[in-house]
Amino acid sequence: MTPEDLIAHYELEPIPREGGRFRQTWAGPDRGDGRPEGTAIVALLTTEPGDYSALHRLPGDEIWHYHLGDPLRMLLLAPDGSSRVVVLGPDVLAGQHVQYVVPAGTWMGARVLGGGSGGGSGGDGSGGGGGWTLFGCTMAPGFTFEGYEHGDAAELAPLYPDRAVEIGELGRA
């Protein structure tokens, strides 16, 4: 299984500004305020240069789900000035998460860990390794592009000086 196979199978399209590819797989009924009751997407990031989830935040909680491939390293910058790194992946006994809730208003960005064909737990179609991560995100109320706020690395780095290098790596103009 390759990223190209997954792109074709799921009919993934580029995610505007943020990076990666996605397809919305579900949207609930409209709530009357322009937002659906909930949304779900399947998404793909790779280790290709420039392919990462750029820093952004959303007005509601977002649940990230690990599906296949290499672990995904998420940088989270909380409104109170704290920060943390969470790794989505299959090795839950080593502290990885198959599901993680990012609280509303938290800046988030993500990059695939591992790399290249044969990396991780296998490049044999088993879903491990190969320089990519297939994951999903779920929100309720649902995602809208109007609620997406793109992060500015130059503004965020002074607020989280211990994460300045990582912020620079996950910024995108």
Predicted regions located by residue number:
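Non-catalytic, conserved peripheral segments adjacent to functional cores
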Residues: 1-100, 109-110, 115-118, 128-130, ...
